[in-house]
Amino acid sequence: MKYLILSLLLLMSNQCEEKKEIPMQKQTTKAPFLWEAANVYFLLTDRFYNGNPNNDTNFGRTKKTAVLRGFEGGDIIGITKKIEEGYFNDLGINAIWFTPVVEQIHGSVDEGTGSTYGFHGYWAKDWTSLDPNFGTMKDLKKLVDTAHKNGIRIVLDGVINHTGPVTEQDPVWPKDWVRTGPTCTYKDYETTTACTLVENLPDILTESGKEVDIPVALANKWKAEGRYELEMKELDDFFARTGYPRTPTNYIIKWLTDYIVEFGIDGYRADTVKHTHPEVWLAFKKECDAAFVQWKQKNPDLVLDDNSFYLVGEVYGYGASNGLWYDFNDKKVNYFENGFNSLINFEFKYNAKENYESL
């Protein structure tokens, strides 16, 4: 009997050993990308990372500047290198917004902070070319492609409101393109839109419906660079396709949307939005959407998702508590009805100082 019991115990023991726990496999589903939930990293291109020290000085920009008012070396290659190193992925970033990289004025100015070059990117000289301090078109393509391979969207910064300041090296644009005064006083709609932000910052006549020619200085620049015929043909094609008049605004819309067609950037942050008429941005968004569709059709293997082009605006002073509207005192404007997916909430800098209970 005792041998029978021992045999049963051994049998049960062997059966227990044979039963192995099957590990539970976690089922993970990748969440779709939503702009409303994006983790956006903003950076000042010149101040982020110097990926190519060989492009740090161009156009004779060797004049001594005030402290931190000159180019410090950050560039497009530097951003790409940090993407490749996993810096952004480690932070959980899925969108990068960086300051403008178009060609800046060659001279320096003093707006009250000492001698300054256009290191920040908001003083455009030529919207059709990149500033060599920031990099080349090839560099930008690699950045966008690398970002997309890492699940990161790219938001460029676009300026339509103004050119760069006037210097000895950078002549003022023609009178049918810009106004040079008065300076904005921000009392109402007119004194916010039909004016210059500051002294010596020519304001594009974004409200103008008058057809204009390319500025002579810009045409001569293109000729010297050997690309005049190409640029003019592209302009002819754009205006023939859209039927738009050749106004200052429409030229710049064409130039900015070229970066979507060429590289497949995912969004624009629009600068100084409230200083132009809102209709400008509705037209801009329409062309951005068309350009994004065109890029997706030409590059089906590179498309990340079915999101449309994203446009966020800098309406300085706008706060989320105002709802859809920005108040000019004599007029309210709903920018969400004029092309924008979202606006920067300037109220947040004050909210951040409040305690949790008061929010």
Language model regions located:
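Sec-dependent signal peptide recognition
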Residues: 1-7
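C-terminal motif of bacterial Sec signal peptides marking the signal peptidase cleavage site
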Residues: 12-15
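N-terminal structural segment of carbohydrate-active enzymes
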Residues: 18-153, 161-163, 171
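Aromatic- and acidic-residue-enriched segments that line the glycan-binding/catalytic groove
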Residues: 57-61, 104-124, 160-221, 286, ...
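The substrate-binding groove and active-site-proximal loops of carbohydrate-active enzymes
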Residues: 62-77, 121-137, 165, 169, ...
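Short, acidic/polar
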Residues: 73-87, 243-262
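Glycine-rich, histidine-containing beta strand-loop boundary motifs that form or position
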Residues: 99-100, 156-160, 272, 315
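Active-site-proximal helices and loops of the catalytic beta/alpha 8
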Residues: 254-359
